[in-house]
Every structure is written in C-alpha cells, then in structure tokens.
C-alpha cells in the first residue's frame, strides 16, 4: 500500500470513520482517520486559500485555511516525517465526490522544499508554482478524473460541460518530479505548500473534499478509495 501523509479539507462528515460531525480540516498520517482536526467553516462559491508547512526541527505539520474577509482555521500535529515517509516522495492534490457532489477546482498551487546539511554548499531545494494550469500539462501527472480546463484551472473531479459537479468521481494531480523530502545528514528539512481552491455545489451537503498529500513516488489511486476515502486510502482502517 502507499505511504500517505495528507492534509484534508473534508466537506462531508463521515462519523463512522471517526470524522467529527461537521466539515473540518484534518491531518492524516497513513490513515483516513485523522490524527488532528479543526472545525472548518466551509464557504461554497468562495475562493479559499490553504497554507501547509513542516519543519523538521519543530517536527510539526500545520495547515491554515482561510477565505478573504473571514477568520482562518488552523490544524497542526507533531510528527517526525523521517519516520513516516520514504526519502523520495511525490506531492499531489486529490479530491472525490460521492452521492453528494461539489466542484473541486484548484486555481493555483505552489510548493517549496529545502534540505540543509552541515556543508554550507549542499542545499537541496525544489520549487514550483502554478498560477494557471495549461491544457496538456507536461509537469503534472493527472490520475483518475482530474483534468485542466480551458480557463486554466485544475479540476480534480468531473464537471459537466456547463460546469456542474458530477457524483462518484475521484481524481488526483501530482507534480512530475520526485521531491527529496528528508535525508539522514540534513540539519533541517522543511517544506511549504499553498493552493487556492473553489468548491461549489448544488447539494445542501457538498461532498467529499480536497487533500494535499505526500506519498511514495509510484503512488496511484487505490482501488475503492472514492467518496469518504478521498482518493488516498484503500480502506477506513
């Protein structure tokens, strides 16, 4: 199975797998059952921003979700990613819809990772930034239903030609280049990721959510990982 660390924006509570009874953001370490969650005042039809950061000195993974003009939601969890993830990984975004649906539109996405070792010259870093997504992106690996639309947005799940979200959809987008996320001799391994998103839904209860995730380089969508499993996990264990 894939090794997954994720930050989830979970729009639909699945209390049977340990979700709180409201939309929330959460940190997932190798399981859909979040290690830490915070209530998320999701605003459909408004562009939101997510900022995720990790620092190997503090060993804390944190995420902040905000909408312009309203207060932000923060979640964090103390974890040493050296003990969880392989040394080389890929970073990605995933989303699903189920019986209920929503658009899972990504408008921009940036990521920076840094590895500092004792030798001053040896700093390993990777940076990418998408402000628009091209129609046939060479630098993204698109999986499942994910596609880039003519407006320059990344649609993680299916939408109709008129832009309406479709149910029972799962899609992911990964940056093509592997990331050297940690190294034994590194003094500091850190990363920052930011993305902007738009969730719209005709349903009273949108579903299911968007994630930023880090996984082994050969990761693929697990069979049966739709809906509440957010395209990341084969089961709810």
Curated annotation (Swiss-Prot):
<comment type="subunit">
    <text>Homotetramer.</text>
</comment>
<dbReference type="InterPro" id="IPR001220">
    <property type="entry name" value="Legume_lectin_dom"/>
</dbReference>
<keyword id="KW-0106">Calcium</keyword>
<comment type="function">
    <text>D-mannose/D-glucose-binding lectin. Has hemagglutinating activity towards rabbit erythrocytes.</text>
</comment>
<keyword id="KW-0465">Mannose-binding</keyword>
<dbReference type="GO" id="GO:0005536">
    <property type="term" value="F:D-glucose binding"/>
</dbReference>
<feature type="binding site">
    <location>
        <position position="10"/>
    </location>
    <ligand>
        <name>Ca(2+)</name>
    </ligand>
</feature>
<feature type="binding site">
    <location>
        <position position="208"/>
    </location>
    <ligand>
        <name>Ca(2+)</name>
    </ligand>
</feature>
<feature type="binding site">
    <location>
        <position position="12"/>
    </location>
    <ligand>
        <name>Ca(2+)</name>
    </ligand>
</feature>
<feature type="binding site">
    <location>
        <position position="19"/>
    </location>
    <ligand>
        <name>Ca(2+)</name>
    </ligand>
</feature>
<keyword id="KW-0479">Metal-binding</keyword>
<dbReference type="InterPro" id="IPR013320">
    <property type="entry name" value="ConA-like_dom_sf"/>
</dbReference>
<dbReference type="GO" id="GO:0030145">
    <property type="term" value="F:manganese ion binding"/>
</dbReference>
<comment type="similarity">
    <text>Belongs to the leguminous lectin family.</text>
</comment>
<feature type="binding site">
    <location>
        <position position="24"/>
    </location>
    <ligand>
        <name>Mn(2+)</name>
    </ligand>
</feature>
<keyword id="KW-0430">Lectin</keyword>
<dbReference type="GO" id="GO:0005509">
    <property type="term" value="F:calcium ion binding"/>
</dbReference>
<feature type="binding site">
    <location>
        <position position="8"/>
    </location>
    <ligand>
        <name>Mn(2+)</name>
    </ligand>
</feature>
<dbReference type="GO" id="GO:0005773">
    <property type="term" value="C:vacuole"/>
</dbReference>
<keyword id="KW-0926">Vacuole</keyword>
<dbReference type="GO" id="GO:0033095">
    <property type="term" value="C:aleurone grain"/>
</dbReference>
<feature type="binding site">
    <location>
        <position position="12"/>
    </location>
    <ligand>
        <name>a carbohydrate</name>
    </ligand>
</feature>
<protein>
    <recommendedName>
        <fullName>Lectin alpha chain</fullName>
    </recommendedName>
</protein>
<feature type="binding site">
    <location>
        <position position="228"/>
    </location>
    <ligand>
        <name>a carbohydrate</name>
    </ligand>
</feature>
<feature type="binding site">
    <location>
        <position position="19"/>
    </location>
    <ligand>
        <name>Mn(2+)</name>
    </ligand>
</feature>
<feature type="binding site">
    <location>
        <begin position="99"/>
        <end position="100"/>
    </location>
    <ligand>
        <name>a carbohydrate</name>
    </ligand>
</feature>
<feature type="binding site">
    <location>
        <position position="34"/>
    </location>
    <ligand>
        <name>Mn(2+)</name>
    </ligand>
</feature>
<feature type="binding site">
    <location>
        <position position="14"/>
    </location>
    <ligand>
        <name>Ca(2+)</name>
    </ligand>
</feature>
<dbReference type="InterPro" id="IPR000985">
    <property type="entry name" value="Lectin_LegA_CS"/>
</dbReference>
<feature type="binding site">
    <location>
        <position position="10"/>
    </location>
    <ligand>
        <name>Mn(2+)</name>
    </ligand>
</feature>
<dbReference type="InterPro" id="IPR050258">
    <property type="entry name" value="Leguminous_Lectin"/>
</dbReference>
<dbReference type="InterPro" id="IPR019825">
    <property type="entry name" value="Lectin_legB_Mn/Ca_BS"/>
</dbReference>
<dbReference type="Pfam" id="PF00139">
    <property type="entry name" value="Lectin_legB"/>
</dbReference>
<dbReference type="GO" id="GO:0005537">
    <property type="term" value="F:D-mannose binding"/>
</dbReference>
<keyword id="KW-0464">Manganese</keyword>
């Amino acid at each position: 199975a894939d090794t997954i660390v994720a930050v989830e924006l979970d729009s639909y509570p699945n209390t049977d797998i340990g979700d709180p009874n409201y939309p929330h953001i959460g940190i997932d370490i190798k399981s859909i059952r979040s290690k830490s969650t915070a209530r998320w005042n999701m605003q459909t039809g408004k562009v939101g921003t997510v900022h995720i950061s990790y620092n190997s000195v503090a060993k804390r993974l944190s995420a902040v979700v905000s909408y312009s003009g309203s207060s932000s939601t923060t979640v964090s969890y103390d974890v040493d990613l050296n003990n969880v993830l392989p040394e080389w990984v890929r970073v990605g975004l995933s989303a699903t819809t189920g019986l209920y649906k929503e658009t899972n539109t990504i408008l921009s996405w940036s990521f920076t990772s840094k590895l500092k070792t004792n030798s001053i010259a040896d700093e390993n870093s990777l940076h990418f930034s998408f402000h628009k997504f091209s129609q046939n992106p060479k630098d993204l690996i698109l999986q499942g239903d994910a596609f880039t639309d003519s407006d320059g947005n990344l649609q993680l799940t299916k939408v109709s030609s008129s832009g309406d979200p479709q149910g029972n959809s799962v899609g992911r987008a990964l940056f093509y280049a592997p990331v050297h996320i940690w190294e034994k001799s590194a003094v500091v391994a850190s990363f920052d990721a930011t993305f902007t998103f738009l969730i719209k839904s005709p349903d009273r209860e949108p579903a299911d959510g968007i994630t930023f995730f880090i996984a082994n380089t050969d990761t693929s969508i697990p069979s049966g990982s739709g809906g509440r499993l957010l395209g990341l996990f084969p089961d709810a264990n």
